[in-house]
C-alpha cells in the first residue's frame, strides 16, 4: 500500500508540474500584435487648415506632428493639432469653435474664462486644436491648460467601447488621457511613465 501511495504522489506531482509549465509558457509567449490602426496620415496643409478653421492667430507647433484619429466616435477622421497663439476666447465667435479646459475641469472647475488667467505655463501657451471631420469640417474645439510635453494617439475603453483618445505626458512624467464624451473633451490621469520602467 505504501508503494502505491508513493507512485500516486509522484504521478500527482508530475501532472501538476506539466500544468504549471503550460501555464508559465502561456504567460511568456508574446501575444499577437494588436491590429494596426486604420488611421492613415493624409497629405494636407495643416497650417492652411488651421488658419481657415481657427483663424490666423494660431501658429502650428513644429515639435508635435498633427494626430489623426476618430476622436468623436462617428466613423470619420478627425485631427488634433498643437498650436500657439493669442487668447483663444477672443476668436470663438468669429471662427465658431468652443474653448474648453478639460485638465482643470477634471479637478472640479474648468471654466476657461477663469482658469486661463491662472495658467502656469512658462513662455508661450500651447493649445490643442481639435477639428472633427476635418475633410468636411464639423465641430471645433480649442483645449487650453492641458500640460504636455508629448502627445500621441492612444486608445481606451469608454462606456465599454474602445475609442481613440489623445495620450499626453507632462514634464513630470504624468500620463493623461484626453477623450470626447459626446459633448465635450475630458482629461483624466492614467498613470506615469515612471510606472512603466
Question: What role is predicted for each listed range?
Answer:
Residues 27-73, 77-197:
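Beta-propeller-forming repeat regions
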Amino acid at each position: 500500500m505504501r508503494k502505491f501511495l508513493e507512485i500516486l504522489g509522484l504521478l500527482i506531482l508530475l501532472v501538476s508540474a506539466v500544468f504549471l509549465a503550460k501555464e508559465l509558457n502561456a504567460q511568456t509567449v508574446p501575444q499577437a500584435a494588436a491590429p494596426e490602426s486604420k488611421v492613415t496620415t493624409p497629405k494636407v496643409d495643416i497650417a492652411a487648415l488651421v488658419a481657415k478653421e481657427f483663424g490666423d492667430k494660431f501658429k502650428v507647433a513644429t515639435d508635435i506632428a498633427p494626430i489623426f484619429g476618430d476622436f468623436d466616435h462617428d466613423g470619420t477622421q478627425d485631427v488634433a493639432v498643437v498650436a500657439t497663439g493669442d487668447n483663444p476666447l477672443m476668436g470663438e465667435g468669429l471662427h465658431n469653435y468652443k474653448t474648453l479646459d478639460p485638465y482643470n475641469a477634471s479637478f472640479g472647475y474648468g471654466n476657461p474664462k477663469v482658469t486661463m488667467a491662472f495658467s502656469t505655463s512658462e513662455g508661450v501657451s500651447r493649445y490643442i486644436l481639435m477639428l472633427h471631420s476635418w475633410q468636411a469640417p464639423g465641430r471645433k474645439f480649442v483645449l487650453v491648460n492641458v500640460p504636455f510635453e508629448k502627445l500621441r494617439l492612444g486608445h481606451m475603453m469608454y462606456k465599454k467601447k474602445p475609442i481613440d483618445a489623445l495620450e499626453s505626458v507632462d514634464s513630470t512624467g504624468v500620463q493623461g488621457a484626453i477623450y470626447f464624451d459626446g459633448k465635450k473633451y475630458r482629461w483624466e490621469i492614467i498613470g506615469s511613465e515612471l510606472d512603466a520602467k
